[in-house]
């Protein structure tokens, strides 16, 4: 148990993307999980990479758990920070993912310089694995979210995760995978949409300190992303 002062300021880590930082009142909030969801190729991984580089430029170490096949070439193209501050775990299964989350939690306990944990993407293996035991999958889902929430709160660092989407068969809307279980654990949720002109719109759909519905536009570029009106 920790005693918390209400006068303690909110810690925020800049993402390195000006319009997104403005949207979030200064950056990713410490102590909580922020979820970014959107269709494939919408820019979720780009935001994760740039946010990681921004944290490192602020003197913080980053743990990055990758299930998407992070491109080293792309990472080095967008990152001009000291990559010795970057710890990458590539995971290949749901069990791998849980082990990586536990390792990240222990590392954050030992090293005060760790300032961000990224998981891209959280739902990849939950979506792909075919298990007959639905309750066991739900329990694992909850356990991993609990571990991430705990390390974020204890160390007052942002945890950034990405999520896949699915189409609701009843109304055709695109929703983040995991439904209520994921939504309940998130204190901040951002949706990225592709625009017909190639730009991306990022919208706050849930946040404990930012008005829902506010949005910004950006475009993916060779060396990162650029904000656009």
Curated annotation (Swiss-Prot):
GO MF, one annotated term: ATP-dependent DNA damage sensor activity
Protein keywords: ATP-binding, DNA damage, DNA recombination, DNA-binding, Nucleotide-binding
GO biological process entries: DNA recombination; DNA repair
Record's signal peptide: none
Superkingdom of the organism of origin: Archaea
Gene3D superfamilies noted in UniProt: P-loop containing nucleotide triphosphate hydrolases (3.40.50.300)
Disulfide cross-links: none
Pfam families: Rad51
InterPro entries tied to this protein: DNA_recomb/repair_Rad51_C, DNA_repair_and_recomb_RadB, P-loop_NTPase, RecA_ATP-bd
Residues at which ATP binds: 38-45
Protein family according to the UniProt entry: Belongs to the eukaryotic RecA-like protein family. RadB subfamily.
Function: Involved in DNA repair and in homologous recombination. May regulate the cleavage reactions of the branch-structured DNA. Has a very weak ATPase activity that is not stimulated by DNA. Binds DNA but does not promote DNA strands exchange.
Protein name, entry field: DNA repair and recombination protein RadB
């Amino acid at each position: 148990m920790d005693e918390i002062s209400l006068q303690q300021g909110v810690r925020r880590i800049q993402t390195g993307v000006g319009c997104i930082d403005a949207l979030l009142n200064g950056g990713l909030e410490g102590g909580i999980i922020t979820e970014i969801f959107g269709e494939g190729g919408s820019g979720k991984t780009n935001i994760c990479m740039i946010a990681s580089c921004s944290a490192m430029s602020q003197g913080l170490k980053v743990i990055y758990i990758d299930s998407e096949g992070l491109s080293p070439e792309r990472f080095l193209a967008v990152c001009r920070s000291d990559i010795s501050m970057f710890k990458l775990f590539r995971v290949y299964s749901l069990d791998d993912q849980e082990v990586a989350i536990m390792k990240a939690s222990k590392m954050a306990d030992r090293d005060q310089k760790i300032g961000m944990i990224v998981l891209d993407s959280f739902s990849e293996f939950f979506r792909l694995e075919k298990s007959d035991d639905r309750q066991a999958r739900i329990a694992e889902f909850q356990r991993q979210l609990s571990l991430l929430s705990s390390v974020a709160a204890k160390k007052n660092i942002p945890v950034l995760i990405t999520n896949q989407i699915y189409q609701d068969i009843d109304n055709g809307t695109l929703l983040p995978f995991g439904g209520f279980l994921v939504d309940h654990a998130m204190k901040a949720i951002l949706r990225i949409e592709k625009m017909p002109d190639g730009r991306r719109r990022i919208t706050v759909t849930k946040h404990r300190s930012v008005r829902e519905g506010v949005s910004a536009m950006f475009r993916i570029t060779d060396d990162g992303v650029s904000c656009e009106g």
